[in-house]
């Protein structure tokens, strides 16, 4: 869907564009998105928004896709002598932070079969860049990054969803997340070490 094609009237900026819809959705947060809420943020009626986006499901998918598009993947630091394992740990941390920053985004980005061509292209380019930087096979890079992203997103989503649940015990979001983040990091380190071992790759491999 191309919301930008129709020319806006002279002197008046368009109120409904894909970028503005995404900005409003990100501000509201995926779990709280409604047609009325996004329309209100854009300064239009919800019926006007319906003319551009036919369903709530498509509206949420549009916002999630834009969140993913804006995500700047952690890339190898050529010349810094960062080992492959250290890089993968840093990438894992960025995956966790992504899930924490954007509650509700995980179901839209973890399933390859519902990913858009643009999302798949971005993933492929990242895998290719890591393969070239560390001089490993593209399929090895794909297995490493896909494994870390999948399990990192799934686990982080569970951690932060659990921390946001009401409990009968007095606690704080910060205290709960700090404890669970430590366990998550430990588990991801073990996953990374195991993935490198399975692929017979040197953890200290430098770019």
Which role fits each region the language model picked out?
Residues 1-4, 161-207:
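C-terminal peripheral helix-coil segments that are non-catalytic and often amphipathic
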Residues 96-124, 157-167:
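Amphipathic alpha-helical segments used for helix-helix packing
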Residues 73-105, 110-112, 148:
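Hydrophobic alpha-helical connector segments
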Residues 29-30, 43, 50-61:
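HTH DNA-binding helix-turn interface
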Residues 65-72:
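Short, basic, alpha-helical segments at the C-terminal edge of helix-turn-helix-like DNA-binding modules
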Residues 36, 45-48:
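Key DNA-contact positions within bacterial/archaeal DNA-binding proteins
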Residues 5, 12-37:
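Short, amphipathic alpha-helix enriched in basic
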Residues 90, 110-146, 182:
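Amphipathic alpha-helical packing segments from all-alpha helical-bundle domains
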């Amino acid at each position: 869907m191309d919301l930008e094609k129709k020319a806006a009237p002279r002197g008046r900026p368009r109120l409904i564009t894909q970028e503005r819809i995404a900005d409003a959705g990100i501000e509201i947060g995926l779990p709280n998105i409604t047609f009325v809420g996004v329309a209100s943020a854009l300064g239009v009626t919800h019926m006007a928004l319906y003319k551009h986006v036919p369903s709530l499901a498509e509206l949420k998918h549009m916002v999630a896709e834009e969140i993913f598009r804006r995500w700047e993947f952690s890339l190898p630091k050529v010349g810094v002598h960062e080992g492959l394992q250290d890089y993968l740990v840093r990438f894992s941390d960025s995956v966790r932070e992504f899930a924490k920053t954007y509650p509700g985004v995980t179901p839209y980005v973890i399933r390859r079969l519902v990913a858009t061509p643009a999302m798949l292209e971005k993933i492929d380019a990242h895998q290719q860049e890591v393969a070239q930087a560390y001089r490993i096979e593209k399929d090895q890079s794909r297995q490493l990054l896909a494994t870390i992203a999948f399990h990192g997103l799934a686990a982080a989503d569970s951690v932060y969803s659990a921390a946001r649940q009401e409990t009968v015990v007095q606690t704080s979001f910060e205290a709960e997340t700090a404890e669970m983040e430590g366990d998550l990091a430990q588990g991801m380190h073990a996953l990374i070490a195991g993935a490198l071992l399975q692929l017979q790759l040197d953890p200290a491999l430098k770019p």
